[in-house]
Regions:
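Proline-aspartate-enriched helix->loop->beta-strand connector
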Residues: 38-46, 62, 168, 172-177
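Solvent-exposed loop/turn segments at secondary-structure junctions
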Residues: 9-11, 30, 43, 50-52, ...
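Short helix-initiation/N-cap motifs at beta->coil->alpha
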Residues: 25-32, 155-164
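Extracytoplasmic substrate-binding proteins
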Residues: 53-56, 60-126, 211, 220-226
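A short, structured surface patch at a secondary-structure boundary
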Residues: 1-38, 49
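Ligand-binding pocket segment of bilobal, Venus flytrap-like solute-binding proteins
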Residues: 140, 158-185
């Protein structure tokens, strides 16, 4: 068993050197059904992004949906890894991967146990900002890694809570994690870069303490399912 096709246009940087090993079979949100059919796969693995196409894809091959549960993020990622181990007859490697990741998580938790600063995660997208906290797609930062969320109630929707400059200052995180969605999808955005160059941002504790941290956007946005 081997992977023969994927959405190569949206490969995260750490997998980019492998892109030419696979046929391009569409995007993260829309499959190229003809290209998939030509590959004659024995199995098609999709995420929630492609659920609307599941019935159509099942005409080509059986479909397995690997998704994540934001209320039990790490638990669902472990389940996905185990499932992939079974599919590709690599159960032992899957178990080893889970053990390694658990060790990394425990290492981070040992450090965050001594951090009391309040944390917010901010997603930048074509010049707009969305805030995320516990119970969200980035809730792993708080619920598994142990960072302390801000006191403000943040809507835990898939796309986060829209926030402006005044709102960000009112929340006033002491640590701000930033994920650039536009960059994750392969496009540089001057609008996004300019979002954090603002007097309101400069007044936040996160800025004053030099704790605005840019996360690897493609890793956090594209690879969230493990």
């Amino acid at each position: 068993d081997a992977v023969t096709g994927t959405a190569t246009d949206n490969m995260p940087a750490y997998l980019a050197d492998k892109a030419d090993q696979f046929e391009n079979v569409g995007t993260l949100k829309e499959p190229n059904v003809e290209a998939l059919a030509n590959l004659a796969p024995e199995l098609i693995i999709i995420s929630n992004r492609l659920l609307d196409f599941a019935e159509q894809l099942e005409e080509i091959a059986p479909v397995v949906v690997l998704s994540v549960d934001y209320t039990d993020y790490w638990g669902s990622v472990q389940k996905n890894i185990t499932t992939l181990g079974v599919i590709f007859d690599e159960e032992e490697a899957a178990e080893e991967a889970i053990v390694t990741l658990n060790e990394e998580i425990e290492s981070v938790k040992a450090k965050t146990a001594g951090i009391s600063e309040k944390t917010l995660t901010l997603l930048l997208n074509d010049g707009s900002m969305s805030a995320f906290s516990t119970g969200s797609r980035f809730g792993f930062i708080y619920e598994t890694l142990g960072f302390t969320p801000v006191d403000a109630a943040i809507e835990d929707s898939t796309h986060g809570q829209s926030v402006g400059y005044e709102g960000l200052l009112e929340i006033n995180p002491q640590i701000l994690f930033v994920i650039d969605r536009t960059a994750a999808l392969g496009t540089a955005s001057d609008e996004n870069a300019a979002l954090l160059e603002n007097d309101f941002v400069y007044q936040t504790d996160a800025y004053k303490n030099n704790k605005i941290i840019n996360l690897s956007s493609d890793l956090w946005y594209l690879s969230g399912g493990g």
